[in-house]
Amino acid sequence: HVMLAHPEVQPRHVIMESEHKFVATPMETGIRFAGTAELAGLTASPNYERADILLRLGKRMFPGLSGTEKTEWMGHRPSLPDSRPVIGKCPDIPNVLFAFGHGHRGLIGAPMTGEIIADLMAKRQPKIDITPFRPERF
């Protein structure tokens, strides 16, 4: 993402731009533009080209936005080779349950994952087949 400190234009609410799929978020110290994902290895160097694109799109969204202090950031998300999360019992340690690897869809998958984990903790059969998410697939 890219963050502009103390911009002249500041939205009061989060704004999602649907055509280019990015978000403008008002922060205490400025405005943050985010919304891209890049698949790369853990040792890959950051590619801030996407941040530059986000800044251009943000300036198009807010025409009065000027070049105030800019910071760029990127971080790793827990993504797995098959793009599915790991949800289920740890095969090696009793009473340990896994629920990770949702990548950039973590917030979307959280309610269903929470229900599955609650069912497993209570020794109930989950409402959906969790075979595609089993830890042993790797």
Protein language model features and the residues they cover:
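C-terminal lid/capping helical subdomain adjacent to the catalytic/cofactor pocket in oxidative enzymes
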Residues: 6, 86, 90-138
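Active-site substrate-recognition segment that forms the wall
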Residues: 1-94
